[in-house]
A protein has these predicted regions:
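Residue(s) in the substrate-gating loop at a strand-loop-helix junction
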Residues: 56
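Active-site loop immediately N-terminal to the catalytic Tyr-X3-Lys motif
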Residues: 14, 61-67, 89-90, 122, ...
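C-terminal substrate-recognition "lid" of short-chain dehydrogenase/reductases
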Residues: 40, 48, 124-152, 156-157
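Alpha-helical segment proximal to the catalytic Tyr-Lys
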Residues: 41, 85-89, 143
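Active-site helix of classical SDR
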Residues: 36, 72, 80
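Substrate-binding pocket helix/loop in short-chain dehydrogenase/reductase
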Residues: 11-13, 20-22, 51, 107, ...
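Short, small-residue-biased leader/transition segments that mark boundaries at the very start
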Residues: 1-3
Length: 158
């Protein structure tokens, strides 16, 4: 099971509305619970499962104008780590993938040429690169990896 449901409602905290805050947290953080919790029992009974949450570089380092998005993704990261400890003995792994700048609708409107200057790899990532990482984490080959947040960001760090 891979969870990726997200929206951005970027705004400086000073100008952010309660609705902008709540909507982002509801979709990302509550979405994690609402999708994951109903699937757990079956995974635990079968003694096998892979849960891969898609988070964000923003959830690791925070981004100005994205306090709501950063908080939501940071919350999913913390929940990933906690849940991994709860279910590891039943051979269920729980990990998160934290993409940086990936060419998707989430990065539309961002000046790619400007941001590429800050990325050591010199480019935005592709959805296929993220999918390859998710595929590995969903495979039997990743059975000893759990509770981890794996960044896929071309070397972009704080």
């Amino acid at each position: 099971r891979v969870l990726f449901r997200s929206i951005r409602k970027d705004n400086l905290m000073l100008w952010m509305t309660g609705e902008e805050w709540s909507k982002v947290l509801d979709i990302s953080l509550n979405g994690f619970f609402n999708v994951t919790q109903p699937l757990l029992k079956n995974m635990l009974v079968k003694r096998y499962g892979r849960i891969v949450n898609i988070v964000s570089l923003s959830g690791i380092q925070g981004m100005p104008g994205q306090a709501n998005y950063s908080a939501a993704k940071g919350g999913v990261i913390a929940a990933t780590k906690a849940l991994a400890q709860e279910v590891a003995k039943k051979k269920v792994t729980v990990n998160a993938v934290a993409p940086g700048f990936i060419r998707t609708d989430m990065t539309e409107g961002i000046d790619e040429n400007e941001w590429k200057k800050h990325i050591p790899a010199g480019r935005f990532g592709t959805p296929e690169e993220v999918a390859d990482l998710v595929g590995f984490l969903a495979s039997p080959a990743s059975s000893y990896i759990t509770g981890e947040v794996i960044s896929i960001n071309g070397g972009l760090y704080t």
